[in-house]
């Protein structure tokens, strides 16, 4: 059920991140080298999740692994326990909550019309449903943290925190962001571009689907204009 995926990606994963923030306040600060393995593990996990995204053929699995990779960055920056790091983690969790939920919603919109989640069988929707293509483009741009969205603010704060803590982490961060951009572009091109494989008539999008997407992306755009609300 798509509602379960949306709630899991938007709320439950982020509650886990919030729990880690609360738990870290009871632990000693990272002046010792005790937390280095956890930070490296979180960043390496983010890269592996991103690489897994690149080889996915199932649209829903791709979006799910995308959520995992973003949480890797969040966990890495929470462990460092700096004000900028916590602000960046909160910003990215809230922004990615909206984005991943919107992507799951769009995947379901495609699934209802094609009855498949295989990427190669969901091509050519820009010819059939141009408004949905616009929503896909916006959601993917937010997923790759395009300025001036809240995703960009969060990732910038996370990058600054990790770079100040250890400059070599920029290699892993940069690689992670590069792969994120690659699979987001791959997801957009696979679902929207190319010839349509459908021979049957496709049902047009309904107002409720556009309303659902508006309620995901417009609050995120508004929060992006005033990020002090969340950080």
From Swiss-Prot:
The keyword Electron transport belongs to this UniProt entry's keyword annotation: yes
What are the protein's UniProt keywords? Electron transport, Membrane, Mitochondrion, NAD, Respiratory chain, Translocase, Transmembrane, Transmembrane helix, Transport, Ubiquinone
Record flagged with keyword Protein biosynthesis = no
Q: Name one GO cellular component term.
A: mitochondrial membrane
Chain segments annotated as transmembrane:
1-21, 34-54, 63-85, 89-111, 128-148, 169-189
Query: What molecular functions are annotated in GO for this chain?
Result: NADH dehydrogenase (ubiquinone) activity; ubiquinone binding
Subcellular location(s) of the protein? Mitochondrion membrane
Q: Which domain of life is it from?
A: Eukaryota
Reactions this protein catalyses: a ubiquinone + NADH + 5 H(+)(in) = a ubiquinol + NAD(+) + 4 H(+)(out)
Task: Write the Enzyme Commission number(s) for this entry.
Answer: 7.1.1.2
Q: Which GO terms describe its biological process?
A: ATP synthesis coupled electron transport; electron transport coupled proton transport
**Membrane topology note:** Multi-pass membrane protein
- Per its database record, what is this protein's job? Core subunit of the mitochondrial membrane respiratory chain NADH dehydrogenase (Complex I) that is believed to belong to the minimal assembly required for catalysis. Complex I functions in the transfer of electrons from NADH to the respiratory chain. The immediate electron acceptor for the enzyme is believed to be ubiquinone.
The family annotation for this protein states: Belongs to the complex I subunit 4 family.
What this protein is called in its record is NADH-ubiquinone oxidoreductase chain 4
Q: What organism is recorded for this protein?
A: Lachesis muta muta
């Amino acid at each position: 059920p798509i509602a379960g995926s949306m709630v899991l990606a938007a709320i439950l994963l982020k509650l886990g991140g919030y729990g880690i923030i609360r738990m870290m306040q009871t632990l000693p600060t990272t002046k010792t080298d005790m937390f280095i393995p956890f930070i490296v593990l979180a960043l390496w996990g983010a890269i592996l999740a991103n690489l897994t995204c690149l080889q996915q053929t199932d649209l829903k699995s791709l979006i799910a692994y995308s959520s995992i990779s973003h949480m890797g960055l969040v966990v890495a920056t929470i462990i460092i326990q700096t004000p900028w790091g916590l602000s960046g983690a909160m910003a990215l969790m809230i922004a990615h909550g909206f984005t991943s939920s919107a992507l799951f919603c769009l995947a379901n919109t495609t699934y209802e019309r094609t009855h498949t989640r295989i990427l190669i069988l969901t091509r050519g929707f820009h010819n059939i449903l141009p408004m949905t293509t616009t929503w896909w483009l916006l959601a993917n741009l937010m997923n790759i943290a395009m300025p001036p969205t809240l995703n960009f603010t969060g990732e910038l704060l996370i990058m600054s925190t990790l770079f100040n803590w250890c400059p070599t982490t920029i290699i892993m961060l940069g690689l992670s962001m590069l792969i994120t951009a690659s699979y987001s572009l791959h997801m957009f091109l696979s679902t929207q571009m190319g010839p349509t494989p459908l021979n049957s008539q496709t049902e047009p999008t309904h107002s409720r689907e556009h309303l659902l997407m508006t309620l995901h992306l417009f609050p995120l755009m508004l929060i992006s204009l005033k990020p002090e609300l969340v950080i």
